[in-house]
Amino acid sequence: MEQFDQLVLNSISAKALKSYLTTKIAEAIDELAAKKNSPKKKAQTKKPENRIPLDLINKNFVSKFGLKGYKDGVLNSLICSLVENNYFENGKLKRGKHDELVLLDIEKEILARIDENSSLNIDVLDVKVLANRLRTNADRFEFKGHTYYLEQNKTEDIINQLIKNSAISMDMKNTIKDTFYMISDELLDVFKNRLFKCPQVKDNIISRARLYEYFIKATKPDDSKIYVILKDDNIAKILNIETIVIDHFIYTKHSLLVSSISNQIDKYSKKFNDQFYSSISEYIKDNEKINLSKVIEYLTISTVKIENTVE
């Protein structure tokens, strides 16, 4: 019993005791009400993490960290952990040459020009980008004795080959406005393990349109960015973010841009506040249900992505 409680109970005053008990009861009721009304977190079932096949990971990276023994593939979380623990110090990319990491020429140039305290430094928020660059998309997969080659702009050929080899079959019951296929768990496992993710299916049924979209994404090169080019320096002033000019282009960090914009979006209305929108409406014409990816597109200049192959 607390000292204050003891003093109250030692008091002869019935009035004081009544007041004390009333207060305690009220506090207990408030506490129960708060617990009852607090949102309960739904138990989330964690999906098993995919393993990246060794032949799809940078060979120098595999060799340096002795990953050749991982015959069933390497967890992506392990790759991220190795990158962060070996190439980063105090939350930032270590200075110097890193032969295993894939850094674009413009990224190397920016790092060479900025000081260690700059917010433009590559930091732990970029670990996932660097880890993803250490793997490449599969150019083929095998299923029941047949090899299927994944090439951009040849998605129709892949689907037709799967049908020809009876790897997938038409679902006549659901095929009305769109063609639907039945796809086995076995083939879905091949997709998950070789192409890093599964297409969206329901009861092993998938539409041709959705399967087509899946293969388009599976053959698309990684386009994750660390730095982006702003359309003009006024954007940087509005968002109050650091930039660097190289060859007349204004560069900033993608993560800085995303963070700054996100801070201006109301989480309930999904809109910018009026004052901020007024300052940036020259670039963003619509303030209804802001799409962050689209906003980034409006504020930046598209660049040609030079594909980095995994060796």
Curated annotation (Swiss-Prot):
Record keywords:
DNA-binding, Late protein, Virion
Entry's Gene Ontology molecular function annotations: DNA binding
Q: Does the keyword DNA-binding apply?
A: yes
| Protein localization | Virion
Q: What induces it?
A: Expressed late in the viral replicative cycle.
Which Pfam families does the record associate with it? Pox_I1 (PF03289)
Q: Which GO terms describe its cellular component?
A: virion component
Listed InterPro entries:
Poxvirus_I1
**Domain of life (superkingdom):** Viruses
Coarse class of the primary localization is virion
Question: What other remark does the UniProt record contain for this protein?
Answer: Each virion contains approximately 670 molecules of I1.
Its function, per the record, reads: Late DNA-binding protein which binds to the hairpin form of the viral telomeric sequence. Required for the production of mature virions (MV).
Name the family the entry cites: Belongs to the chordopoxvirinae I1 family.
Protein name (record): Telomere-binding protein I1 homolog
Annotated source species: Fowlpox virus (strain NVSL) (FPV)
